[in-house]
Amino acid sequence: DIVLHSATKYLGGHNDVLAGAIMTNDAAIYDKLFYNLNTTGPVLSPFDSYLLLRGLKTLALRMERSTQNAQEVVVFLKQSPAVKEVLYPGKGGMISFKVANQDKIPTIINSLKVFTFAESLGGVESLITYPTTQTHADIPGDVRASYGLTDDLLRLSIGIEAAQDLIADLENALSL
């Protein structure tokens, strides 16, 4: 078994480091990975290492606040008539939701004041992404749809701002 983890997101926590981790519980796989890593030398710079360690110091606090905020935002989204479906497993700060009227997506995104329209996820600030035009824009629409990435889907990365500010921002944008 191999686990790949993006340290760029929550572990770094401030959208300023690019890093990852590879883990395995198999000695033979570890030996192969270690050989490749040793011969190719993909290591973090000292500064990136510092940034990652800095982020780890506040990880528990950031995750607690992000999760708490996300749960409050989910309650709001589930009650909003502008939202037809909320996709949230119950933990963490990542929320996906489908809007009732996808033609309003540009208005929603452009009306947000607290959320930032950006692709990086897992930082201290709250972000909104539109996979159709951002992260998955190069994937044909029918393929995206087969993965559940429909054109009415928006993704939120919930940060550590006050939950009531996030909800008010979404409420305003979704009401337009």
Q: Where are the regions a protein language model picked out?
A:
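Well-ordered beta-strand positions enriched in small/hydrophobic/aromatic, beta-favoring residues
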Residues: 20-22, 95, 128
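PLP-dependent enzyme catalytic core of the Aspartate aminotransferase-like
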Residues: 62, 128-176
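Conserved small-domain helix->loop->beta segment predominantly found in fold-type I
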Residues: 71-119, 141-145
